[in-house]
């Protein structure tokens, strides 16, 4: 399985093409739209979300709600393009009229300046920010929706939530009270902040509100969990086959993510071995299992069968309504950075995007290990493999 996305933030369309999805997977546009709606929601989002109503169109690879095994093309229309059609026009030369929204003062923390240098966009840094914008993650969430449908066929569930926004934190000790991810999902999705509890929801709202009043932005952390994952996805044979490494790359590849950890993560660096390693047990009814999950579901780059636990660090959004020091790329004179429409925080949406990326990497790993031509054959192979693992 592989995919690619295309599209600019204020261009007419966002597009994704997915290859390698087995034939016979049942999927509807509503399945994808539900995930796109989750991405748009969240406390602290900006005015763009009031303009867009993200809905997907299936262009290729799906017939009668079933995948064909051929490339799947997904399309989401940018409603805001109506306000930018002249500025983003692909078939018109640049004029004074369609250059009104030039960006010449790069934002610290954004791709503006380095992207302009790299691609020689001397005249307008909008050529950078239109693609580097997090609007592109719309299509990663759409691809993730397809991946989640595939994973659900073999009993794998994936869910993301917010750990903290600034100093306001969810109470992670409450995670033990949930029987499964569906029960957890019902709680976190009931809050606009995607927090774990009502107290954290209120605290996070307060932080976001005060940050907005200060014309500032704020970061945080999100956590993604996956259950029902077969043992042995990934490999210890080569470094680039390690599944945790692939997931780490996928998480840090999301806009504004600056760190990732598995299980106990960086806290494990302050502990001793007998406090960290997940002891091994065996029971005839379930086979091998671990007594804890401090390593986040991975050993040697392979899944252990325990819950995958991944956390990502999200930096504050670089666009500030109280802009920071910058330099005009034309005059080289000091100026305040450009201002683009932005969110106070994207952490609430980041949980959904990170969830999608974990689902994509897990789906890739499943399709690497099992039959990728037909969904029923894949399910048969996974079921047989689970029995083999249990009997080991």
From Swiss-Prot:
Pathway field: Metabolic intermediate biosynthesis; chorismate biosynthesis; chorismate from D-erythrose 4-phosphate and phosphoenolpyruvate: step 7/7
Residues that hold FMN according to the record: 131-133, 255-256, 300, 315-319, 341
Pfam families: Chorismate_synt
EC category: lyase
Molecular-function GO term, any one: chorismate synthase activity
Cofactor remark from the record: Reduced FMN (FMNH(2)).
Domain of life: Bacteria
Sorted UniProt keywords: Amino-acid biosynthesis, Aromatic amino acid biosynthesis, FAD, Flavoprotein, FMN, Lyase, NADP
Cited PROSITE patterns: CHORISMATE_SYNTHASE_2
Catalytic activity: 5-O-(1-carboxyvinyl)-3-phosphoshikimate = chorismate + phosphate
Record-linked InterPro entries: Chorismate_synth (IPR000453), Chorismate_synth_AroC_sf (IPR035904), Chorismate_synthase_CS (IPR020541)
GO biological process: amino acid biosynthetic process; aromatic amino acid family biosynthetic process; chorismate biosynthetic process
Cofactors: FMNH2
Listed GO CC annotations: cytosol
PANTHER family for the chain: CHORISMATE SYNTHASE
Similarity comment: family membership: Belongs to the chorismate synthase family.
Subunit organization: Homotetramer.
NCBIfam families: aroC, PRK05382.1
Descriptive protein name: Chorismate synthase
Organism of derivation: Leuconostoc citreum (strain KM20)
């Amino acid at each position: 399985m592989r995919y690619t996305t295309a599209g600019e933030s204020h261009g007419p369309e966002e597009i994704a093409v997915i290859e390698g999805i087995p034939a016979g997977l049942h999927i509807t546009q509503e399945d994808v739209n539900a995930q796109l709606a989750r991405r748009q929601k969240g406390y602290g989002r900006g005015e763009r979300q009031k303009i867009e109503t993200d809905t997907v169109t299936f262009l290729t690879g799906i017939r009668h709600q079933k995948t064909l095994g051929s490339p799947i093309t997904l399309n989401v229309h940018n409603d805001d393009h109506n306000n930018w059609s002249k500025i983003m026009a692909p078939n018109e030369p640049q004029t004074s009229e369609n250059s009104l929204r030039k960006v010449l003062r790069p934002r610290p923390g954004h791709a503006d300046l380095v992207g302009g240098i790299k691609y020689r966009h001397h005249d307008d840094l909008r050529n950078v920010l239109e693609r580097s914008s997090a609007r592109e993650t719309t299509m990663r969430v759409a691809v993730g929706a397809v991946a989640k449908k595939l994973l659900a066929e073999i009993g794998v569930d994936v869910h993301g939530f917010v750990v903290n926004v600034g100093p306001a934190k969810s109470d992670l000790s409450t995670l033990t009270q949930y029987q499964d991810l569906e029960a957890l999902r019902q709680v976190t999705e009931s809050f606009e902040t995607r927090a774990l509890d009502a107290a954290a929801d209120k605290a996070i709202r307060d932080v976001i509100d005060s940050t907005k009043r200060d014309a500032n932005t704020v970061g945080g952390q999100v956590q993604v969990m996956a259950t029902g994952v077969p043992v042995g996805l990934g490999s210890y044979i080569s470094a680039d086959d390690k599944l945790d490494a692939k997931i780490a790359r996928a998480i840090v590849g999301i806009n504004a993510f600056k760190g990732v950890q598995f299980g106990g993560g960086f806290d494990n660096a302050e502990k001793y071995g007998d406090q960290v390693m997940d002891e091994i047990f065996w029971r005839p009814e379930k086979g091998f299992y671990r007594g804890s999950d401090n390593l986040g579901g991975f050993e040697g780059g392979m899944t252990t069968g325990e819950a995958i636990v991944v956390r990502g660090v999200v930096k504050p959004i670089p666009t500030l309504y109280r802009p920071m020091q910058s330099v005009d790329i034309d005059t080289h004179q000091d100026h305040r950075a450009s201002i683009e429409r932005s969110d106070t925080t994207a952490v609430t949406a980041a949980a959904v995007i990170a969830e999608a990326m974990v689902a994509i990497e897990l789906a890739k790993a499943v399709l690497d290990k099992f039959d990728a031509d037909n969904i029923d054959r894949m399910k048969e192979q996974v079921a047989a493999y689970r029995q083999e693992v249990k009997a080991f």
